[in-house]
């Protein structure tokens, strides 16, 4: 018996069925995509938060290291108001002379390679606190750099503000 060819109306029913299947598949993909996009945004924010934590820890460690050198007498400060802390973050980048400046053994030590960029503001600008400022103050007294914080007003994933980290 010869093979039967599909009739035109049977062909149209088959193609209609595949069109419905295509539409269902597209709807399923759209639903999955709508679930993935917020997760991707959340993941990107989490990565930026991690970079912020690392940058803050790096700068705070550099400030502490500077203070340690002053306390050990390796860095001589002429201004008593500095309380053993650097005047600016740039001082940590440019470096300070350690030891007796007249001695051939003196050397310049840099505590930071560069001031890191705040991942949420996109700038290498940070809020600064001096030793004389209140712990929660957002205005810098300018005497020294005791602490740094983000200038971002955005809320973190844990519902705190980045400037409070």
What name fits each language-model region?
Residues 15, 21-24:
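Internal alpha-helical transmembrane segments of multi-pass membrane proteins, especially GPCRs
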Residues 40, 47, 76-80:
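Conserved short-loop catalytic and cofactor-binding motifs
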Residues 14, 32-35, 43, 47:
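Residue-level signal for short amphipathic helical patches enriched in basic/charged
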Residues 1-15:
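N-terminal leader/signal peptides at the extreme start of proteins
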Residues 61-165:
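Low-complexity, acidic interaction segments enriched in glycine
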Residues 41, 45-56:
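Membrane-proximal amphipathic alpha-helices
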Residues 23-38:
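Alpha-helical hydrophobic helix detector
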């Amino acid at each position: 018996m010869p093979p039967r060819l599909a009739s035109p109306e049977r062909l149209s029913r088959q193609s209609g069925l595949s069109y419905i299947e295509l539409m269902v598949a597209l709807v399923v993909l759209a639903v999955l995509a709508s679930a993935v996009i917020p997760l991707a945004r959340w993941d990107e924010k989490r990565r930026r938060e991690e970079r912020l934590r690392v940058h803050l820890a790096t700068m705070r460690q550099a400030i502490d290291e500077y203070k340690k050198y002053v306390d050990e007498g390796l860095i001589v400060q002429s201004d008593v108001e500095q309380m053993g802390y650097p005047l600016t973050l740039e001082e940590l980048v440019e470096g300070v002379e350690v030891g007796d400046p007249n001695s051939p053994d003196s050397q310049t030590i840099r505590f930071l390679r560069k001031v890191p960029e705040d991942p949420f503001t996109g700038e290498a600008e940070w809020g600064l606190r001096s030793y004389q400022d209140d712990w929660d103050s957002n205005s810098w007294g300018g005497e020294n750099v005791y602490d740094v914080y983000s200038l971002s007003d955005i809320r973190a994933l844990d519902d705190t503000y980045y400037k409070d980290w």
